Design a protein with these regions (language model features):
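Small-residue-enriched flexible segments
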Residues: 1-164, 168-177
Length: 178
């Protein structure tokens, strides 16, 4: 296994490329609207300071989720603004990259716009593994008649040994299901 480098890939002919995404996060709290933002700064959620929303949410969580919130907190941005009831998989997951305790502002790894629907998310090994397994099984079922000739797996830094406690977790599931 290599930990650095680059790969080049050229494809030609009559090919179909399908994309499968496993976010590996589960929603927590309520769906909210961004009421104030500036670039990647989240200034208001339903008229409240985002950090205050998080503090209230924290008080309602069990010990395990409270621990996860301290280092595995994400913001899910609803991808389709016309969805009435977005569910897991309908969100573009973005990192919470900073916070200002004085103003209650959160910095997010995405430019935000007022009116967007968002919900906080947590990532844990169990949810992440189940999500990957489910999307790969669905892909395999949907493509049963097509012979898959190749596949590429791109995994983010938040997964792998850091999340699961051992190497190759995602690769093993990928190999088994595809």
């Amino acid at each position: 296994m290599h930990n650095s480098g680059a790969i080049g890939l050229a494809l030609q002919g009559n090919i179909t490329v399908d994309t499968v995404v496993a976010q590996g996060c589960r929603p927590i709290g309520q769906l909210m609207h961004i009421t104030e933002s500036r670039q990647n700064l989240l200034l208001g959620l339903d008229g409240q300071a985002p950090l205050n929303v998080l503090k209230e949410l924290f008080q309602t969580m069990n010990d395990r989720d409270q621990a996860l919130m301290q280092n595995s907190l994400f913001l899910g941005v609803v991808m389709d603004e016309f969805l009435d009831a977005p569910k897991q998989g309908d969100f573009l997951i973005r990192n919470v990259v900073g916070m200002d305790a004085r103003t209650g502002t959160l910095a997010i790894g995405e430019e935000l716009k007022e009116g967007q629907m968002v919900q906080f998310h947590l990532r844990d090994a169990e949810t992440s593994s189940a999500d990957l397994t489910a999307v790969l099984e669905r892909f395999a079922t949907d493509n049963r008649e097509n012979q898959v000739q190749g596949a590429l797996l791109f995994s983010c830094l938040g997964r792998g040994q850091y999340l699961y406690g051992h190497a190759n977790h995602d690769t093993d599931i990928f190999h088994e299901k595809i």
